[in-house]
Amino acid sequence: MIKICLAGFGKMNHAVYEAALQNADVKVVSILEPTPQKIEGVEMFTEPQKAFALADVIIDFSTKEACVENMCIAASMGKNFVIGTTGINEEGLKKIKTATASSSVSGVLSGNFSVGVNVFIETARYLHERLPDYEIEMVEVHHNQKKDAPSGTALRTLAALGKTKEEIPVHALRMGD
């Protein structure tokens, strides 16, 4: 059985938790969260070292700032990890890569696990290459609890086009839940 620690307990890690309940091969054993809640059968922690000690793998959907620190700690403890947190800057990614390289851990970084989003990004890149004179403007809509605006997915789409948010207008709408 693979023992999992969830770093952050927002919408995405709630979904991971629910999926883990349906799979006998994995178990969420700990959650790292600044404001712990009570969840039956799961240890809640505010300190990464304590939360990670119980797990084989860390799944991080926290904040870009916390994620960098979390993954450096995870690597130093020999814990493999999956990063779903978006918006990590180049300096943060470099810190994670350095920490990972000096240990024996493996990690996965994906700002969006949706097949549809990844196909969309590739389609946008394809169209931009073939229609270079067309104007581009980006409008994205997320639930009102989404913390980053524009989202990491929007920024990744811009990067795939070789553009920045200063070059292409980005309208980030947050509404509903």
Task: Set out the residue ranges of the language-model regions.
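C-terminal substrate-binding/catalytic lobe of Rossmann-fold NAD(P)-dependent oxidoreductases
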Residues: 3-7, 11-49, 131-177
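Short catalytic-loop micro-motif centered on adjacent basic/acidic residues
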Residues: 5, 58-60, 81-84, 108-110
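Short, ordered loop/turn segments at secondary-structure junctions
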Residues: 34, 86-88, 112-114, 141-143
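Hydrophobic beta-strand scaffold residues
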Residues: 28, 44, 81-82, 106-107
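P-loop/Walker A phosphate-binding loop and immediately adjacent motor/lid segment at beta-alpha junctions
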Residues: 7, 11-16, 70-80, 85
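Beta-loop-alpha module in the N-terminal Rossmann-like domain of NAD(P)-dependent dehydrogenases
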Residues: 56-76, 87-92
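Rossmann-fold NAD(P)-binding glycine/threonine-rich loop
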Residues: 72, 85-107, 118, 123-127
